[in-house]
Structure formats: structure tokens, C-alpha cells
Amino acid sequence: AVNFSSTGDAADCVGCHTSHTVYRKNDEQSPSYDLNVAGLCSGCHADSVIVGTYFSAPEDSLAAASVALYHETVHGTRITDTGLVVSATCSDCHSPHRTLPGDSLASTLHRDSIATTCGRCHEDVLAKYAGAAHGGRSSGDAGDGHGHETPNCVDCHTAHGIVGAHEPNWFLHTVEECGQCHERLYETYLGTYHGKVTELGGELVAKCSDCHTAHDMRPATDALSSVHPTNVVATCAKCHEDANESFARYYVHGDPMNRAEFPLLFWPWVIVTAYVVGALLLFNVHTGMWLWRNARHAIRERRELRS
């Protein structure tokens, strides 16, 4: 309404519902029928002039590509390929008659409202998220204490580029998603067997969500946490059937550089590093002496031949 009154290029009632052939929303002939909404919105949001006018800033690049992204995602393909009318379409998230900017407190897509908006379809996920470490906080909170806002659905899944969690590409990159906030844990993960195989493209080794769950992650001190001492063996056993308490004591995020917290990793690292460096130095010294000896021997032989 604001853009329509000021510039005249925004959608109005007739633009979405037509003028005289107005059908009910549940009528397949209606432009606002669930299977038709994405195409209806594309009329403006795929228009190069409108996109260039309102979404030309670098930070709006994803919004500018929203139509193309949506049609390739799990929501869009369910609509276009299978005709699944319960799959989320534009009006389910943006509210058709009160579409507000994402920074508006009244918007369904404000940071404080996104989880509730997604939860209208994903009720079970919302229930887990709300009681977990990431849920139950607002954008006004201090976040995680390290300069990161508390993540919501869009931070992990994106807004329009949502792919199925079963997709190999998503599963491989979920570690990077978590690492954007958990930098230190990301680095220590990459130093483990799981992390190294993941970097090589391995899909079967454990990722963050395998151990911490996807939406119900909690501190290790929480008895409901999948990594609480009473639960961690069962968590490991999901992949390692013979896992026991000794197996579960493995340093998942051990840092060999942290002497105070991981002395059993630090000192072996120091000893092995010193051994390897010492062996290489000895090898280089020995090789240099051997080459020098051969060179002197060759020079001596030439002199003897000349004489």
C-alpha cells in the first residue's frame, strides 16, 4: 500500500484478484489459489524493472533472486512438481494483505517472528526449537555473548533457497553453517577424523546435527541434551553400534594447542612435533654431510687422475 500510493507500481487488489472474475481462494481458477500464488507474485518480483528499482543494493541480492530460488527449493518444487497445496508459498510467509519489511516489529518475518511463522507448518520443530539453546530469545537479547544474534530458521535454512535436509549438498555444508557462529568449535571439529573426512566430501561421518540434533540442541550440562554424560553413549551408538563409556570419552572438540584444558593432547603433540622436526633436521644434516663427502671424494679423484 505504501509503494502503491507513492510510486504506483505495487500490487493492488485488482492486480492480485482481477476485477470482475474474482474467484474464491480455494478455487483452482483463482490467482490466489495455493498452486498459483508463486506465479502471481512472480509477475512483479521477477520483473527486471521492479527488481532493479527496489532490490539493487548488494545486501538485497538474495531478495532480488527470491523467485528463481524459490522454484528450485523444497517448498517450490512441491508446489510446481507435485501439486502439494500444503507446501509453503509466498502468502504463507509474507501475509498477503499486510506485507511489511522484515525489520518491522509487526512483520511476520521480523527476527522475533520468523520461528512462529515457520512453526505454523512445522509445529513439532518449533516445539523443539523453543525449548532449546537457540530458541526462546528475542533479537534484543545479547545473543551468544560473542557478537552473534541468536539464530532462527532463516539463518540456517535461508529464506528462499531452502533445500531438503536429506540433500547431500546441504548435509555437507551444514557444518559451515554452524561454524559461522561457533568458529572455535568449527576449527576443532575440522581437526578430528569426522572433520577431515567431511572436508574431503564424505557424507557418512558425523556432522554437528548428528551429535547435537538439528533443533533440540542444549548445553552438555542439561540432562535432556544429546551430549549430556548420561546420553552421549547412546548418541555415539547411533553410528557406532558398539560404543561404550570409554569410547564416548573421545575428545570431539579437543584442541592440542590448549595446554590447560587438554594436557593429554598438548604434550603428545609437543613430543611428536619435536620428534618429527628433530628427525627432519637430522636427515637434512646427514644428507648435507653425505653430499659434501661425495663432492670432496669426486674432487680428490679428479686431481689424482690429472696427476
Per-range role (PLM):
Residues 1-307:
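Short sequence/structural segments immediately N-terminal
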